[in-house]
Amino acid sequence: AVQGNHPSKLNPLTDTSVFLANEIQNKQYKIFYYDPKDLSVVNSKVVAEGFFIKFSYSNKKFYKIIKKQNLDLSKCKFILIRQDPPFNLEYISTTYILDTIKTKVKIINNPTSVRNISEKLYSSKYQKYMPATIFSQNMDEIKKFFKKNKKVILKPIHSFSGNDIHLLTKFNPKLVNKFIKKHDHIMCQKFLPKISNGDKRVFIINGKVCGAISRVPKKGSILSNMSKGAKPTNIKLTSKEIKISKIIAKDLKKENIFFAGIDFIDQKLNGDINVTSPTGLKTLYDLSGINLAKTFWKELKA
């Protein structure tokens, strides 16, 4: 089963959920798809109202709903948690619900681990590999940090896809205050001008570093997210990036995280450890012919 945003909201040309589902469908598995809002606990059973679906890259419409159904999810072999953040209370509630069946069904990523690993805050243990970074909502701390670093990126801790990211080149208490009011604790990071050359997204599957792509921001932008117009390219990782990636991959495996994406800018970890719904596998396949969806399911012994 796939727990995710409705297929009509997905772009099959880049979407990793579709890519993973299509691959397992080729192995004769049936795909059941549901929205997190349709997840319930009824008579002590975890059920979802959703539909069986078929994906096809060759058809004009890339999916076909076969049959709507209310399904007992404990009968599934695998469940992929694939809805986009924000990581809010609704997201957290779905992890608690799925926790109750995780001994019966293989859930990727493990719902307890998804809940425990804050995608930004988890990186605080890797700060020696990162540009100068603080997590705070204290105005004095943020001001001090800005004075020291001159150009600072402000990021919400629980958002995604480059949403609400600000580059601060002049300290603006009004703007910072507004940002804190909206997001509570925020991530402040020394700006790395080499972002204009692109970042690197590294894919980790079952504790192994499996591949990477680069994403180059469009002219005049600092955002390397493809959803914000960044252009993906093929890339090789440096030995330094591989070393850091392996350390994180080993830690994530211990934390029961099967699939993750981590990002580098200028050989520095940018602090996003993506464990909710990492993306980029379809793009890697289109650029290089490397099919990590095959690796993903092979590692799960599907």
Residue ranges and their predicted role:
Residues 28, 40-42, 204-209, 267-268:
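Short acidic-glycine loop/turn motifs at beta-strand connectors
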Residues 8-135, 141:
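Conserved N-proximal alpha/beta basic substrate-recognition cap immediately N-terminal to
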